[in-house]
Amino acid sequence: MARIAGVNIPTAKRVVIALTYIHGIGPKFAQEIVEKVGIPAERRVHQLTDAEVLQIREAIDRDYQVEGDLRRDTAMNIKRLMDLGCYRGLRHRRGLPVRGQRTHTNARTRKGPAKAIAGKKK
């Protein structure tokens, strides 16, 4: 099992699909990486040589922000908004939708499970 960017990549899958197991690399970036390195898209991970795995690893480290670094940057951006006290930061702080969605009836994913109101019956 190849290990790239701290993630164990499944060996039976095609390289393009297997790279999407890394946080921060989707199908588009995976295709770009494979084209840059020059590996055929239909090749499977267990068919890769050590040199090819090393090339993929270097391409990801050089050109993309993945896994822990990406998560840390995202968390720092949210923390910055919260520290500024801007509208988006307040919405993050209160656990409400940030991008203008309605909250009167929906937004259960962001707000959590519904809270029962005492004395309210049908």
From Swiss-Prot:
- Report the GO terms under cellular component: cytosol; small ribosomal subunit
Stretches of the chain forming a coiled coil according to its record: none
Task: Name a GO molecular-function annotation.
Answer: rRNA binding
Lineage top rank: taxon: Bacteria
Q: Which key words tag this protein in UniProt?
A: Ribonucleoprotein, Ribosomal protein, RNA-binding, rRNA-binding, tRNA-binding
One GO biological process term: translation
Q: Which HAMAP family does the annotation name? A: Ribosomal_uS13
Q: How does it assemble?
A: Part of the 30S ribosomal subunit. Forms a loose heterodimer with protein S19. Forms two bridges to the 50S subunit in the 70S ribosome.
Which NCBIfam families does this entry report, sorted A to Z? uS13_bact (TIGR03631)
Similarity annotation: Belongs to the universal ribosomal protein uS13 family.
Q: What is this protein called?
A: Small ribosomal subunit protein uS13
- Source organism (scientific name): Rhizobium leguminosarum bv. trifolii (strain WSM2304)
